[in-house]
Amino acid sequence: MRFSKTPFCCLFILFSAMVLFPLLSGCGADRAAQKKKAGTLANLGNAMAAEGNTRGGLQKLLEAAKLDPDNEDIYQQTALVFRSLGDYQLSLKYFRKALELKPQFPEATNNMGTVYLLMGDWNNAIKCFREAAEDIKYETPQYAYNNMGLAYFKMGETQKALQNFETALRLSRSYAVVYLNLARLYEKKGDFKEAEANYREAILYRPKDPAGHMGMAKLLIKQGKTEEAKESLIKIIKDDPRGLEGREARKLLAALQS
């Protein structure tokens, strides 16, 4: 007598499916839990870095990257922390990882350009900034145009720098950093009137930023406007008593009063 194998086969397949489904579900749940933990670690790392604990924040971000190795945002955040630590090669490495995962990532491209800018590699910096600026999906191209202007300014190509700064301002009239860069450009050219006007615009949009007040104070000193310069220096000391600009302002004020 021959027995049919069909019922046994059906039972085996059914049993296998019953076992396999929980395993696959478990893997999916574990993966989701890992991604969630990675996100928590990344947020903690960014917060620590923002508060000044840069190395501690970096460790959290590296842990996050291990848990979620396909997350381009975590790689970019890690790259930014390496940049702040002055480790430019590792910063570039992590920006490249982010861009491998997401080639059209203009924020990362622009930020990678800032690393080249800090390294003095103007050509690669400009290449990154131009690519980011021309990406139609980039929501803040004014950052890339400002950075490109700064790179050209560093290269001594004043006209190209001016064009990019002006483009950045057309995109965002309240972008204080551009006014600051324009002020420095005009000051270097010896056009103190335009420099002063742009310093005032920078201060208008970022009144608490000591950089604008310091630039203005130094320009006023050059022009012999010492009383106005003193007002700017006192403002810096009040707003940034322990910072670099605050300490420099004290020295300049003491020199003016002696």
What are these regions (language model features)?
Residues 33, 67, 101, 135-137, ...:
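Structural marker of alpha-solenoid helical repeat scaffolds
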